[in-house]
C-alpha cells in the first residue's frame, strides 16, 4: 500500500501462514533461549493454611476464576513451576503484584496486538483482579490470582511461539510439536525476574520480517474498520471502463485514498461522475494487490473485492499470523517457499532477501489440492518421463484409449512393464488396455517439449508424490486463478529456479541448465550437493517484495477451516 511503503522488504510468503523475511540461521535450540537466566528472587511464601489452596488448584488443573477454568493441558508445567519455587507464589510479593506480573498482565490485556483474543487470556478480567488485591485480599485470593496469572501466561506464550492450533489437525505436514517450549523452564529463567518480560516473550515470535510487517499492518486495518460505515459500492452487470460514468465514483475515490491505493496528496473531484484519471490508477493498484490482473476495469469481480469489509481483511491477517507461527524459526539452507493462494514460489538468499520468484499453477481446488508440508529438495531431473499416477491412468487414460486406440501415440505416451520394458507406443490392443486398467502395465509420457512436466522437475520425496516442474502449456500462467493441476506445482520459466537450486553444484549455471533441458539426454538426474528446505504453505494475506500488503482468495477453503478451529478451541 502506497501510504505504508517506506522501503522494500524481502519476503517468502506463507496465509493465513505466507512466508516473508525468513531468518536463515541454523541451529536454534531451546537451551539457547535460556542461556542467560535471570537471577531468581523468591515470591511470597504461603502459610500452612495457604498451601492447600495452591495444591488444590494445581493438582486439580482447575481455577474457577479463569474464563476457561480447566487448564489440564498445562497442569504438569504449572506444577513443575510451583515446585521449583518451593510452592511459593510467583507473581505476588508482600501482597502486591511484582513488576514482572504487571508486565505480563499488560501483554494479556493487549493480546489483540498480536492477532489473538484477549478474552482467551482473561484480558478484560485483570483490571478488577488488580483492584481486589488492593482491598486486603485473603491468602486464598492471592493463590487464585497467582495461579490464574501463571496459567494465562502459559496460554499466551505457547501460541505466540508455535500457534494455537496444531496444523496436523488439517493433515498438514508441519511439525509444531517439535517446537513446543518447556514453559515452566522458560518462565522460571526468563520471565519471573526479567527486567523486560515483554522483550523476552517477543523473542519467541517468528523472527521473519514478513511476519513483523504483517503484524504492523493489523492496527492499520483495524483503523480502516473503524472508518467503515458499511456503505457498499454500486454493483455492476456490465464492466465499467475508463472514461465511462459510474454511480460510485466519489465513494470509490474515498475508499482507495483511505487504504492507500491512491496517494494521499492526490486531489479528487468531490462531485465527479466519470470513472477516469487517478481512480483508474488506484483501481489497478488495488487489483494487483488482490490477485487480479490490473486492467483498471470495474468488473463484477473487482467490485466484489472492493466491497469486502475491512473485518474480513483483518481476519485474513490474523489467520496468516497464526500460520506463520507454525513454521520453523530457522533453516539449514535458504528455503524455497510456495504460497498456494498467491500462486507464487520464492527462493531465498542467505541474507534473507528474495533471490527470485515465479508464478505457479497449483492443484485443483476440487479433488486435487496441493498438500501443505515442509520437505527437502534432493535432486533435479532433466527431460523427465511423466510417470502417470494410478488414479489418472485408470480414471482418465483408459477412457481416452477406449474412445481412441491411437490416443497413446498421439500424446507421446508409451506403455511399459513394471521393469520399464516398452510394450507399445502406438495402437493399444484390448489385452494391453486390460493391463493398463488393472495396473499390471504402466503408462508414461516420453520426455520432450510436449511432456506434461515440461523439460525439468524438482524432487522432494513426499507421500503425495508432489513436485515442482515445468509445463507444456505456459499460456495458463496468464490466468488470475491458476488451480489446474492434479496436485503438483507447475513453475513458470522453471530454468531460473532450477539454476538457483543447483547453484552449489559445481558447473551448474543457468546456461548449462538451459542446454541440458534442450539437450538429447533424457531422464538425467542431478543430486544436490546440499539438500534445500522446501515449504508449501497457505497464506491469504502477505506483504510482497515492494512492501505492499496483498490479499488472495481462500481458494481451498483453508481460512474457513482454521477460523472454525480457532473458534471452538480455547488456548
Regions found by a protein language model. Give the residues of each.
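Well-ordered beta-sheet/strand-loop patches within structured domains
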Residues: 2, 25, 30-77, 81-83, ...
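Bacterial N-terminal signal peptides that target proteins for export
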Residues: 2-14
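Bacterial N-terminal signal peptides
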Residues: 13-23
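N-terminal, post-signal-peptide region of Sec/Tat-exported proteins
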Residues: 68-116
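A generic structural motif
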Residues: 74, 92-94, 106, 114, ...
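A cross-kingdom signal targeting lumenal/periplasmic-facing segments of multi-pass membrane
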Residues: 97-174
Amino acid at each position: 500500500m502506497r501510504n505504508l511503503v517506506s522501503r522494500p522488504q524481502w519476503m517468502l510468503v506463507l496465509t493465513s501462514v505466507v512466508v516473508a523475511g525468513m531468518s536463515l540461521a541454523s541451529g536454534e535450540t531451546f537451551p539457547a533461549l535460556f542461556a542467560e537466566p535471570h537471577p531468581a528472587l523468591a515470591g511470597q511464601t504461603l502459610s500452612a493454611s495457604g498451601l492447600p489452596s495452591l495444591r488444590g488448584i494445581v493438582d486439580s488443573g482447575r481455577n474457577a476464576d479463569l474464563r476457561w477454568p480447566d487448564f489440564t493441558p498445562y497442569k504438569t508445567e504449572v506444577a513443575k513451576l510451583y515446585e521449583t519455587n518451593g510452592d511459593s507464589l510467583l507473581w505476588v510479593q508482600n501482597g502486591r503484584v511484582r513488576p514482572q506480573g504487571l508486565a505480563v498482565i499488560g501483554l494479556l490485556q493487549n493480546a489483540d496486538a498480536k492477532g489473538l483474543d484477549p478474552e482467551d487470556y482473561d484480558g478484560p478480567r485483570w483490571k478488577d483482579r488488580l483492584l481486589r488485591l488492593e482491598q486486603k485480599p485473603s491468602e486464598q485470593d492471592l493463590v487464585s490470582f497467582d495461579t490464574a496469572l501463571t496459567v494465562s501466561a502459559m496460554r499466551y506464550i505457547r501460541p505466540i511461539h508455535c500457534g494455537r492450533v496444531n496444523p496436523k489437525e488439517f493433515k498438514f505436514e508441519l511439525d509444531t510439536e517439535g517446537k513446543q517450549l518447556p514453559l515452566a523452564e522458560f518462565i522460571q529463567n526468563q520471565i519471573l525476574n526479567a527486567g523486560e518480560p515483554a522483550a523476552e516473550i517477543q523473542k519467541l515470535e517468528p523472527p521473519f520480517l514478513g511476519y513483523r510487517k504483517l503484524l504492523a499492518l493489523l492496527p492499520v486495518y483495524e483503523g480502516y474498520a473503524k472508518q467503515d460505515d458499511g456503505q457498499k459500492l454500486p454493483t455492476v452487470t456490465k464492466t465499467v471502463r475508463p472514461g465511462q460514468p459510474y454511480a460510485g465514483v466519489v465513494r470509490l475515490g474515498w475508499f482507495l485514498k483511505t487504504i492507500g491505493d491512491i496517494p494521499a496528496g492526490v486531489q479528487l473531484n468531490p462531485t465527479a461522475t466519470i470513472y477516469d484519471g487517478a481512480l483508474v490508477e488506484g483501481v489497478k493498484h488495488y487489483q494487483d494487490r488482490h490477485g487480479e490482473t490490473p486492467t483498471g476495469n470495474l468488473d463484477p469481480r473487482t467490485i466484489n473485492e472492493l466491497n469486502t469489509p475491512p473485518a474480513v481483511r483483518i481476519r485474513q491477517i490474523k489467520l496468516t499470523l497464526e500460520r506463520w507461527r507454525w513454521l520453523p524459526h530457522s533453516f539449514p539452507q535458504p528455503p524455497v517457499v510456495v504460497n498456494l493462494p498467491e500462486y507464487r514460489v520464492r527462493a531465498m538468499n542467505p541474507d534473507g532477501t528474495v533471490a527470485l520468484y515465479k508464478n505457479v499453477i497449483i492443484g485443483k481446488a476440487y479433488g486435487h489440492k496441493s498438500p501443505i508440508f515442509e520437505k527437502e529438495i534432493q535432486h533435479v531431473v532433466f527431460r523427465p518421463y511423466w510417470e502417470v499416477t494410478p488414479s489418472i491412468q485408470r480414471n482418465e487414460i483408459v477412457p481416452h484409449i477406449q474412445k481412441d486406440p491411437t490416443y497413446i501415440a498421439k500424446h507421446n505416451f508409451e506403455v511399459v512393464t513394471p521393469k520399464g520394458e516398452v510394450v507399445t507406443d502406438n495402437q493399444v490392443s484390448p489385452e494391453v488396455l486390460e493391463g493398463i486398467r488393472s495396473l499390471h502395465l504402466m503408462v508414461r509420457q516420453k520426455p520432450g517439449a510436449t511432456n506434461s512436466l515440461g523439460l525439468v522437475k524438482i524432487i522432494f520425496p513426499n507421500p503425495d508424490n508432489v513436485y515442482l516442474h515445468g509445463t507444456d502449456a505456459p499460456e495458463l500462467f496468464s490466468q488470475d486463478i491458476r488451480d489446474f493441476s492434479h496436485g503438483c506445482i507447475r513453475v513458470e520459466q522453471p530454468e531460473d529456479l532450477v539454476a538457483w537450486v543447483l547453484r552449489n553444484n559445481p558447473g551448474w549455471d543457468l546456461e548449462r541448465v538451459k542446454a541440458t533441458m534442450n539437450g538429447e539426454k533424457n531422464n538425467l538426474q542431478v543430486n544436490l550437493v546440499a539438500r534445500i528446505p522446501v515449504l508449501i504453505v497457505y497464506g491469504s494475506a502477505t506483504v510482497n517484495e515492494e512492501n505492499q500488503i496483498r490479499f488472495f482468495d481462500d481458494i481451498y477453503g483453508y481460512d474457513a477451516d482454521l477460523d472454525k478451529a480457532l473458534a471452538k478451541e480455547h488456548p
